[in-house]
């Protein structure tokens, strides 16, 4: 299993199909399965760190916009605009770097029941909302669930 890189691979496959991420809940579930590295049914903060480490090309513990979007564009150029929008969401303190503070904040948003782990349902809810929010960057103007 390859953390968020698997997301990109999955979305890349979707892009060959016209980049229709619908049904969003199915896309989100595929992403969850790929990111639940130990397959225990929960996504943890440690798994988030592992997921984002693939983008950290200089291995300094922070992910710049350039690192993130370059990785996405290399693997899935059709997601260029979406990658910038997601980076803006992830960079919670707007300091142009994704670091521990941003990872913790993003994790807390996803962990709606505050049990220090993200269930498949919490993951699905987060990503379906993201896909709908940014549908104009990847979809065909029709919300799906």
Each language-model region and where it sits:
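Short, charge-rich, low-complexity alpha-helical interaction segments
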Residues: 3-6, 57-62
């Amino acid at each position: 299993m390859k953390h968020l890189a698997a997301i990109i691979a999955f979305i890349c496959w979707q892009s060959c199909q016209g980049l229709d991420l619908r049904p969003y809940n199915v896309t989100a579930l595929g992403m969850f399965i790929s990111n639940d590295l130990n397959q225990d049914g929960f996504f943890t903060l440690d798994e988030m760190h592992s997921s984002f480490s693939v983008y950290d090309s200089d291995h300094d513990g922070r992910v710049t916009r350039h690192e993130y979007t370059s990785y996405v564009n290399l693997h899935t150029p059709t997601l260029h605009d979406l990658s910038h929008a997601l980076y803006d969401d992830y960079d919670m303190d707007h300091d142009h770097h994704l670091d521990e503070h941003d990872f913790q904040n993003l994790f807390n948003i996803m962990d709606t029941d505050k049990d220090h782990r993200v269930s498949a349902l919490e993951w699905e809810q987060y990503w379906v909302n993201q896909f709908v929010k940014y549908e104009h960057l990847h979809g065909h103007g029709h919300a799906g669930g």
